[in-house]
Amino acid sequence: MSEEEIPHVAPSEHAVVGKEAGARMLANACAARDAFYASLGAIDGDVLAPLVNPSFMGGPRWPSLRQAWRVIRRPDSIIIASDGLSDPFEDDDDIFEPRGYLVEVCVEAPLSSFENGDIAGSWLFDLVYQLSQNVADHGSIDLLVERYGSVSMALDLQAPPDGLEDENEQVGVLIDSTAPTIPAFFDTPYGPVMMLTATVLQPAELAAIGEAENRAGARAALARALAASPTGRLSVADRPAVILP
């Protein structure tokens, strides 16, 4: 299809034109996201960010190009959350569209998962990092979650704990917006943003989803079983599977 044949998509009602208006939109989006994250716990002052933007090396592009993650501390757990997937998009005509990919993603784990204090070097940060890049690469994960209630992924983590990888040396995650400890959405001046929580799966749980005739139903049943388990929707490596193939 030539450029002349690509249908024109009209800007949304919240779109703005020009660099200054776009900068204000970005500042408003960041302020709304920061306020939401602060409502979840104590936010570390420093963000986690790569020295070189992955999009410069062939990785997926985030809406405002900036890629970062926040660490949010609770009394008994730590949340690692993406910080930028819901930034405004800018097109070649300096038109800024708010809310980016319409989502942010996070993982919550017990304090014991970070006993050495190296959050940026942890397998849980690797999980959130890879999930964030998958979301940016796909572009419409919000539509999948709205349609099916949840999605699952198999990720190639660099150094996961023993016993988490399946026969393909991948680690499964369940992704949805129903975690009882994290709100499903947060508000911005331009509309809501979906907050997706990833829960790491045991290999048997990932296999159960893959073998189910109704995978959406299997994911929903797994989400309910996880929520009712002692660890809830926290990502815990050494727990028993709550559902089997």
Segments the model singles out, each with a brief description of its role:
Residues 1-245:
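Short linear motifs embedded in intrinsically disordered, proline/glycine-rich low-complexity segments
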